[in-house]
Swiss-Prot record:
It is a multi-pass membrane protein. Binds 2 heme b groups non-covalently. The chain crosses the membrane at residues 33-53, 77-98, 113-133, 178-198, 226-246, 288-308, 320-340, 347-367. Heme b b566 binds at H97, H196. This is Cytochrome b. Belongs to the cytochrome b family. Heme b b562 binds at H83, H182.
Length: 379
């Protein structure tokens, strides 16, 4: 009798995606982050669902409903902090996943890469709207500042901002719609992730060497299922250490002050995972220019495949490109640090230099260094 796993229409899909999938024999731990992102998404959807059962999206009661969850709901505090810190883990995995793609040339699978960029934007939008929901000071002022950026769009900007707000300022209508969008987006992200996986399985996974691995494949199960489970255990361990020992480590103390439109916090800043983009935004004195730089800081990933000038796919055997890659990582860490600092000397100058370097590395230096490496190898 034929195995039902391979014949039943539903189990066949699961089988071909997670069990009998031919995978390269040499993919390293850097290939774990796809499954870890899936686990993060599941954790966020489940904790978010339970939070939504007790949360009220009204300006008068939003802050106290979050307090109620933490104080009165059974294990509400752990659900709330798992959700808040789960977002941080999500972004850590996202950044490492994108970094892996850049380092090993995975961006050459252009469909998978482009869906990935759309996913990144969707997750960033979801996280931003989620940060507004507790209705603390940083929630309110963060929402005001970031939505206000759209007013830089010529002609329609002001109308667009007021349309998004549902009034003349961030208020009850804004909070209600942000909650609605924050609830629906993770399900859209799930669908996009399935498409991301569909496109990936059209080509098969890349591997550290960047060389086609058709001649050396192993089944996904048990080799990579056990490897993914190990990664998942590390992820959950890290998340629970964060939740149980220092749940507010990555948050902002200002968000424990209820939102007050009459009192502006001294330093308005987003969550840590947006600081690099926020630093790029602030480093340009012009409002529209800053907004364009902010969008392009992520959108620049879309043109990376077009700028691939090397004859090798991966950076594994390209020491000069490796140096440049780690310079980019250092630059992003610098931008993250600058984004959390006040707008004063010398932080402004450092931010501007780091922003210029970021775009220089990706758009100019990487392609040039790749050509130099080709010539060094007499190709």
């Amino acid at each position: 009798m034929t195995n039902i796993r391979k014949t039943h229409p539903l189990t066949k899909i699961i089988n071909n995606s997670f069990i009998d999938l031919p995978a390269p024999s040499n993919i390293s731990a850097w290939w774990n982050f796809g499954s870890l992102l899936g686990i993060c998404l599941i954790i966020q959807i489940l904790t978010g669902l339970f939070l939504a059962m007790h949360y009220t999206s009204d300006t008068a009661t939003a802050f106290s409903s979050v307090t109620h969850i933490c104080r009165d709901v059974n294990y509400g505090w752990i659900i709330r902090y798992m959700h808040a810190n789960g977002a941080s883990m999500f972004f850590i995995c996202l950044f490492l996943h994108v970094g892996r793609g850049l380092y090993y040339g995975s961006y050459m699978f252009s469909e998978t890469w482009n869906i990935g960029i759309i996913l990144l934007f969707a997750v960033m939008a979801t996280a931003f709207m989620g940060y507004v929901l507790p209705w603390g000071q940083m929630s309110f002022w963060g929402a005001t500042v970031i939505t206000n950026l759209l007013s830089a769009i010529p002609y329609i900007g002001t109308n667009l901002v007021e349309w998004i707000w549902g009034g003349f300022s961030v208020d009850k209508a804004t909070l209600t719609r942000f909650f609605a969008f924050h609830f629906i987006l993770p399900f859209i992200i799930s669908a996009l992730a399935a498409v991301h996986l569909l496109f990936l399985h059209e080509t098969g996974s890349n591997n550290p060497s960047g060389i086609p691995s058709d001649s050396d494949k192993i089944p996904f199960h048990p080799y990579y299922t056990i490897k993914d489970i190990l990664g998942a255990l590390f992820l959950i361990l890290t998340l629970m250490l964060l939740v149980l020992f220092s749940p507010d480590l990555l948050g902002d103390p200002d968000n424990y002050i209820p939102a007050n439109p009459l009192n502006t916090p001294p330093h308005i800043k987003p969550e840590w995972y947006f600081l690099f983009a926020y630093a790029i935004l602030r480093s340009i004195p012009n409002k529209l220019g800053g907004v364009l730089a902010l969008v392009f800081s992520i959108l620049v990933l879309a043109i990376i495949p077009l700028l691939h000038t090397s004859k090798q796919r991966s950076m594994m055997f390209r020491p000069l490109s490796q140096c440049l890659f780690w310079l980019l990582v250092a630059d992003l860490l610098t931008l993250t640090w600058i984004g959390g600092q006040p707008v004063e000397h010398p932080f402004v100058t450092i931010g501007q230099l780091a922003s210029i370097l970021y775009f220089m590395i990706l758009l100019v230096l990487m392609p040039i260094i790749s050509i130099i490496e080709n010539n060094m190898l007499k190709w």
